[in-house]
Amino acid sequence: MSGPDGFGKDHPIPEQLEYNLPLSYESDKIEVIDSLDINTYLQIWNDCQGGLYKYDFYYGGLESGEIFLRCYEVTSNTPLSEDRLIEQSRVKISSQKQFGKVVNKQPFTIYEGDWDDYYAARVEVWFKSSETNKESKLMEKVYRVEGWMR
């Protein structure tokens, strides 16, 4: 295991910042639509260790393509686990016309930081069209995260 990198200590969560907590699988919390746009919904789940996560994503009509995540530390806008995160979180989707679950428990890892050393991350959900290769951001949500110590 590598030693602490101090990323979370160097990026404290601003006091007035509103953020979400990843859910645990044992949670009995009811999932609710969490956006002003009722056609989007993102939920991050804790996995087996700090820094390891899974995500669910619901959305309205989409053409076929790929869904993936980009994450940034909130106070400095520092990209998190940039290339690896995009590849790990990438899910190919088929065209859909109605609101529904697009991504189910797709794993991803945030490497910056240490266990129990929390900081705020802006989690962005992106879509890349298989027809045009155009990328567009579908939504973002702020979560309290920690890094994976390897």
Residues of each region from the PLM?
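Hydrophobic residues positioned within well-ordered beta-strands of beta-sheet architectures
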Residues: 53-55, 121-123, 141
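A eukaryote-biased signal for short, well-structured alpha-helical docking elements
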Residues: 1-30
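Short, solvent-exposed, Trp/other aromatic-anchored flexible loops in extracytoplasmic proteins
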Residues: 87-131
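Surface-exposed loop/edge segments in extracytoplasmic proteins
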Residues: 77-89, 137
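Conserved aromatic beta-strand anchor motif in extracellular beta-sandwich/beta-rich domains
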Residues: 69-73, 125
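Short beta-strand elements
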Residues: 3-10, 58, 130-150
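Contiguous beta-strand segments within globular domains
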Residues: 22-70
